[in-house]
Amino acid sequence: MAADMPDPTLQNVVDQKELKWIFVGGKGGVGKTTTSSSLAVALAESGTRNRVLIISTDPAHNLSDAFRQKFTKTPTLVNGFTNLFAMEVDPQPDIGEMEQLEWAQDSFLTELAGSIPGIDEAMSFAEVMKQVQTMDYDTIVFDTAPTGHTLRLLNFPTILEKGLSKLVALKGAMGGMMGQVTRMLGGMAGGGEGAADLPDQLLGKVEGMLDVVRKVSAQFKDPLLTTFVAVCIPEFLSLYETERLVQELAKFEIDCRNIVINQIIFPESVGGSRLLDARVRMQQKYLDQFYELYEDFHILQLPLLEEEVRGPEALKAFAVNLLKPYVPAPPTDAAARQAALVSEVAALKKRVAELEAALAKK
């Protein structure tokens, strides 16, 4: 590792007070929820934010498990904190939820929207963004689903902008004809002028949502307001997926300058086990590749832990590792003796095998 590499912590994220949106994502099973939860804790305890919100967009919703507290699609104050809130949302809405959206009450808009790929998920996401925008949060952390779902989520503003623009254009082009039909049907049904004006009212709602989407889209592309923290482990598939993620983020013009490498087995903690020694060598090979590929990134190394990180206190303790380089503790005397014993037994087995082979030749 070069001496002039960026600081190997997430302190830069905490110090950037202007940050509004922080996405945490990567391959499944690499520790995204633990990292995002701990980062949210670090932000809340930094003294630089009055209110922090963490949102899970992963259908698995591990956020409740991480904090040992049930969360819903409404922001809830996290136990043990005064300024940290959490909520769990599903970017894939069910039919009942879609029918509640204001724009969905116009059948013409609904049919048009249904012809645009991905618009249903994107509109649901826009409703969440609209809700969040009205709340007074300094920073919002997204605990995202695995990489493929995350990339689709980050593309929602673009999908929405194109889709809603089409709706507005089509509605405008056909407005006269649709207005006549609506007034006629409204009069026949006894709906009066209110029913006739409904399409225009709903179109106004769509245009208002389009304004929100454009604002969020612009913020996502502003490195002062948005950043993405990639989480991975030192293995081939995770390295490959991280590279793909970083490239896609560049296409979306979303800032990414921090990588958290999780589940590392440090040589100091091995204590002589052949299996762990082999694992350390394999991990080191991929760690070297990470540093070659991302020499201008903040790369944070986190250890493979003996226990799961669950509950507010455990997350507070783990959050310390995000803000300063992790220093592995040397093996205890008991661990060292056990490792030495394992090594001696392995050596004896090897010697016995050699003697048996020698006897077999005679």
Curated annotation (Swiss-Prot):
Function in brief: ATPase required for the post-translational delivery of tail-anchored (TA) proteins to the endoplasmic reticulum. Recognizes and selectively binds the transmembrane domain of TA proteins in the cytosol. This complex then targets to the endoplasmic reticulum by membrane-bound receptors, where the tail-anchored protein is released for insertion. This process is regulated by ATP binding and hydrolysis. ATP binding drives the homodimer towards the closed dimer state, facilitating recognition of newly synthesized TA membrane proteins. ATP hydrolysis is required for insertion.
Gene, per the UniProt record: ARSA2
NCBIfam families in UniProt: GET3_arsA_TRC40 (TIGR00345)
Protein's name according to its UniProt entry: ATPase ARSA2
Residues annotated as catalytic: D58
Natural source organism: Chlamydomonas reinhardtii (Chlamydomonas smithii)
EC number(s) stated in the UniProt entry for this protein: 3.6.-.-
GO BP field: tail-anchored membrane protein insertion into ER membrane
Keyword field: ATP-binding, Cytoplasm, Endoplasmic reticulum, Hydrolase, Nucleotide-binding, Transport
